Amino acid sequence: MKSDIQELIKANHDFSEERDWDQFHNGKDLAIALSIEANELLEAFLWKDANDVKIEKVSEELADVFNYAFMIADKYDLDVKEIVLAKLKKNAEKYPVEKSKGKSTKYNEL
């Protein structure tokens, strides 16, 4: 049984494959596209109060960011759950609760 994330990755993969777009999806271009979409997400917040954003725009741009992240994971055969949990573990070591709780200080300045 596939996880929700695996289903999303497969749906994204199938969408691209049906259109023969895989030929354009090298790691560099996928990373650039992800960055562009992340900036479009930022644009949804530009010059607005946090409560005045258009949720539909945020939702669409966030979906684009996720889709490109999933495409990169698929391209390099990365297990999304595994890498996210590994990064959370690493961050927990860099930001122990007793030193970082309630602070925005970078780990090397704690």
Where are these regions (language model features)?
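Flexible "arm" and connector segments at domain edges
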Residues: 1-110
